[in-house]
């Protein structure tokens, strides 16, 4: 019996593919591959090449060494032989060829789908017109959270609840150095989590160019280095994401305004920043720039968080105004001018002047250039691709996932949708259930929600009961000397089952997943109250909020069970 040590496997399906590859090597009688142990136990004929074994595994993107021998790099020339033995990932076993899957895009949905499809035995062609990695790692989640964190630290140096004992200072902010640090981490993560993974997987072919449908079975790709290529497919996933939407305000397009993309890579901090919009992106970046030293004015068409429980918008608005951020509710710009380096915004309440303008009113699906009609793929009036719970479009073998659909615009939703689309494309049956989907807004205090608000429950005919616990009842908040915010629990009347949680609190995003699991497991509020929660954690606030349905928590000792 020969034993190989294998590194790089991430699941049982990986082990299954390694087993299949090894058993195609001449001389291998059987292979028992274990993902948890990282080993392969082989029954082989005398004279079987050990290099052939390790190269077969390497062809799948993993590394293998003989358990009783030092690693060897002597694999030159063997990869071509291995391709003949195992079919080179894009050749069939027997008379069949692998399923040909095309993925358009390279963000969260696209990557998840590509990796799952390969795991299921397909060959994937991934088409990307721009930078590998999509919005999240390049111009979205990652750089924005780095900027927000830096701004938070600057804010704490300027003022904190402990200024009486720790002298406040005015931080010297070098935006260019912060930007260099931010972009270095972006590039590091893009390579580690996207480019490196794609380069190391022989079953994925990356095509750099812009795709459009030719018909229901093929795409025309305008290659970035010139020319065009037709790419045929058995299954296709559209995962092209979304881009900042720009409202039709007279004069706006003629001005040098920012979207979030430009704001995140600017190496300067405007003295005065006007923000059109009250989207998640608008609010996160508005507070970040304010904390880094800009005078910020937000123009909100409605109130902040107007689609959510009213208490959320009230709490965040109060927090913003306390920091000196101007929040102008029910205010729209009717015209934008840029004169002598200054933006002038005309509103119903007078003019607003600023050195820079950020437009963050939402995001629009990247679907206009795809020629969806050529493949019979339906989209709604906003350009979002219409899909069912299995991510199928109106053309059954064409799928879509992520921000190019009408799914909630979160990268973890996109990735989950991409994975399930790949399962369905390769013969499985998977649906995306968003009934317990968490959402987090990285303002300070943070906003975190899951499940129903009271208004949403009533709209669906569900009778509710609710309790709101202010943070001056949460020991962690008291110890922090920061009691801004609240935790609200919504339950189904009668059953007592938890159906929704809304939280406004520092690090609210760190407590919401506990609420997700409680809702997913159909826990009652009493069952939640009976659980053990560690003392002096913010998530303990969930237990205290649950206890308010049956008792006055103000009358409890610090850590009463």
Curated annotation (Swiss-Prot):
Positions with a binding annotation for FAD: 110, 130, 135, 145, 211, 403, 411
Positions of disulphide bridges: 136-141
Gene Ontology biological-process entries: detoxification of mercury ion
InterPro entries: FAD/NAD-bd_sf (IPR036188), FAD/NAD-binding_dom (IPR023753), FAD/NAD-linked_Rdtase_dimer_sf (IPR016156), Heavy-metal-associated_CS (IPR017969), HMA_dom (IPR006121), HMA_dom_sf (IPR036163), Mercury_reductase_MerA (IPR021179), Pyr_nuc-diS_OxRdtase (IPR001100)
Cofactor: FAD
Entry EC number(s): 1.16.1.1
Catalysed reaction equations from the record: Hg + NADP(+) + H(+) = Hg(2+) + NADPH
Residue span, HMA domain: 1-65
Chain residues that bind Hg(2+): 558-559
Broad EC category: oxidoreductase
Binding site for a metal cation: 11, 14
Domain of life: Bacteria
Swiss-Prot/TrEMBL keywords: Disulfide bond, FAD, Flavoprotein, Mercuric resistance, Mercury, Metal-binding, NADP, Oxidoreductase, Plasmid, Redox-active center
PROSITE patterns: HMA_1 (PS01047), HMA_2 (PS50846), PYRIDINE_REDOX_1 (PS00076)
Alphabetized Pfam families for the sequence: HMA, Pyr_redox_2, Pyr_redox_dim
Cofactor, how bound (note): Binds 1 FAD per subunit.
GO molecular function annotation: flavin adenine dinucleotide binding; mercury (II) reductase (NADP+) activity; mercury ion binding; NAD(P)H dehydrogenase (quinone) activity; NADP binding; oxidoreductase activity, acting on a sulfur group of donors, NAD(P) as acceptor
Statement: the UniProt record of this protein carries the keyword Disulfide bond: yes
Record carries keyword Transport: no
Miscellaneous notes: The active site is a redox-active disulfide bond.
Function: Resistance to Hg(2+) in bacteria appears to be governed by a specialized system which includes mercuric reductase. MerA protein is responsible for volatilizing mercury as Hg(0).
Family from the record: Belongs to the class-I pyridine nucleotide-disulfide oxidoreductase family.
Assembly and oligomerization: Homodimer.
The name this protein goes by in its record: Mercuric reductase
UniProt organism field: Acinetobacter calcoaceticus
Lineage: Bacteria, Pseudomonadati, Pseudomonadota, Gammaproteobacteria, Moraxellales
Gene of this entry: merA
